[in-house]
Each structure stands twice: as C-alpha cells, then as structure tokens.
Amino acid sequence: MSYREEAKSILEQAKNEITNAENSKVLNDLRVKYLGKSGIVTSLMKQLKDLPNEEKPIFGKVVNELKESIEKLLDEQKEKITEYEKEEAYKKLWVDPTMPGAIRSVGHLHILTKVRNELEDIFISMGFSVVEGPEVETPWFNFDALNTPEWHPARDEHDSFYIDNEHLLRTHTSPVQIRTMLSRKPPLAIVSPGRVYRRDYDATHLPMFTQMEGLYVDHDVTVKHLKYFLEEFARRLLGENTKIRLRPSFFPFTEPSFEVDIYFNNRWFEVLGSGMVHPNVFKNVGYDPEEWRGLAFGFGIERIAMVKYGIKDIRDLVRNDVRFLENW
C-alpha cells in the first residue's frame, strides 16, 4: 500500500472515530491516539528519515495534510461536544417555574411566647402597662415587703432556690410590684410577666416557669373591680361565654384573698390567685392604706396554656419535642 493510500485509510478511520466521540474525555484520548508523541501520525513522520530524498517532500506533504485534517476534525468535534455539554449543564440547572415549590420547615413562636403575648395584649387593652424586674432578688423584696414573715413555709430552703443568705431566685413576680410602687406614685395599673423559680417538678409543676401578676392601685378600689378585670380577662382569652368563680383563700399579701376558677370546655379549672392588697404591703412601700386601695392577681402562663390548649403534662412545654411543638 502506498503512503497516500495509507494516509487516506488513517484519515477515514480517524474521521469515523472522532465524529462518533460523545464526550471530551473520549475526544482527548483520540487526540493522543493520532497526534500524541507515540500517535499514528507521529509514527508516520518518523518514517521520513528512511525514504529516498526525492520522496521525502511528497511524503512530508501527505503526512502534514493528514495531520491538519485530523486536527480540524478534532477541533470541530470539540466545538460540538462543548456546546452539547453546555446544553446538558443548563438542563440540569433549569427550573420549571410552573412546578410547585419545595416544602420547607417554617419556624414559629413557642406556644408559651404566643400565650404570653396574647395575655399582655389583653391587659394592655384594659389600661395596664407591662413591667419587668430582676430574677435574682433579696428576701426583703421577695418576702418581707409582701407581708410574708420569716416563719412562712415559702421561705424555707426546701421550697426556694437560695444563692446565698442575702439572695435567692424569685419565687413569684410580686417583687416587681414592690419595686414599681417604690418608684411610682399611685394610681397605677401594671402586669409583670417573667420567669420564677420553685423547688417543684411533676406533671403540673416546673422548677422554672413563667408567671404574670397584675396590680391595680387607685382610690376606692373594691372586689367588684377585681371581679370585673378577671371576668374580662377570661372572656377575652377563652371566649365570651367563659365563666369564673371566686373561692375564699389565704395569701399573706392580700386580704381578702381568692382562688379563681375558670369554667371552660365543660369543666372548672383552678387557674389563679387574687385578692385585695394587704395594708401592710402598702405601708412597706410608703403608700397610705387609708387613702389607697389595690387589687392583685397572679397566674402561671404555662397553666393558662394547658387550659386553653388541653395540654395534660406541663413538662411537654419545655421538652423541645418538635412533634409536640409543631402542633401549636
């Protein structure tokens, strides 16, 4: 076979392989096969030195033309493959705007935050302002100023978290009322939400829970005002047909004192404590009990959430179980 025929045969073989190359890797392998250091065309060029001088120019021309033809085929196929690979990449990136979006988890407020916000809004709408205070208190603010003597069980270390002899974690938010009365002149109407701490843990009690207490001080305040605020609070929270009842009780900082039950979902729930501010509390903050009268009430926000949403175990509110939390 003459070298022209051999070159023609090589070109036909190369054309067939190159035009059928499907990706850049295959095409690069073919470039090495034909034009690499040990490639077919390179091997032909090495034969040049063994030819007679008169044949060398013709042979060299044939081999160079073969090389140029193969390079052209490779470049053309590379362009086609590059374009094809771009199109495939675009297809992978393309998104059909008419398809429904991917469902993503959406965060929301914790149920206790929702209930607290709702409670604050209710009392703000009735003219109360929201006041907060420190969670670490002295016994005077937490007990003495609230007419709770040293012999009272609530002051026992088994019931309260003492940091040292002079400080403890507050057992209620009532100290906020004392601080407010010491810094403001009456009349006043406040609610004080916040975390409180007691040594108690079971299905209905937590060692740390959130409480909201209310205080209203003015001239001629009576139990009728207390009953009005509590009835209005219950109706706005749980519905217009919600009923309440007051039962006589005892708290050292109120006189008279009442436990308050709310009738909801065909049963009575014990929800909060309340009463008329004890004269000794007014004396401790410099208010004249002959001139001013006050009412007070307090409840656990967790308890309100349990009643409103039918939650059986208070501990579910702090376990951070997503299966529970996503229900609210």
Swiss-Prot record:
GO terms for cellular component: cytoplasm. GO terms for biological process: phenylalanyl-tRNA aminoacylation. GO terms for molecular function: ATP binding; magnesium ion binding; phenylalanine-tRNA ligase activity; tRNA binding. Its cofactor is Mg(2+). It holds the Pfam family tRNA-synt_2d. Mg(2+) binds at E255. It catalyses: tRNA(Phe) + L-phenylalanine + ATP = L-phenylalanyl-tRNA(Phe) + AMP + diphosphate + H(+). Binds 2 magnesium ions per tetramer. Its EC number is 6.1.1.20. Coiled coil: none annotated. Signal peptide: none annotated. Gene3D superfamilies: Bira Bifunctional Protein, Domain 2. It comes from the Bacteria. It is an enzyme of class 6 (ligase). InterPro entries: aa-tRNA-synth_II, aa-tRNA-synth_II/BPL/LPL, Phe-tRNA-synth_IIc_asu, Phe-tRNA_ligase_II_N, Phe_tRNA_ligase_alpha1_bac, Phenylalanyl-tRNA_Synthase, tRNA-bd_arm. It is found in: Cytoplasm. Keywords: Aminoacyl-tRNA synthetase, ATP-binding, Cytoplasm, Ligase, Magnesium, Metal-binding, Nucleotide-binding, Protein biosynthesis. HAMAP family: Phe_tRNA_synth_alpha1. Belongs to the class-II aminoacyl-tRNA synthetase family. Phe-tRNA synthetase alpha subunit type 1 subfamily. Tetramer of two alpha and two beta subunits. PANTHER family: PHENYLALANINE--TRNA LIGASE, MITOCHONDRIAL, PHENYLALANYL-TRNA SYNTHETASE. This is Phenylalanine--tRNA ligase alpha subunit. It comes from Fervidobacterium nodosum (strain ATCC 35602 / DSM 5306 / Rt17-B1).
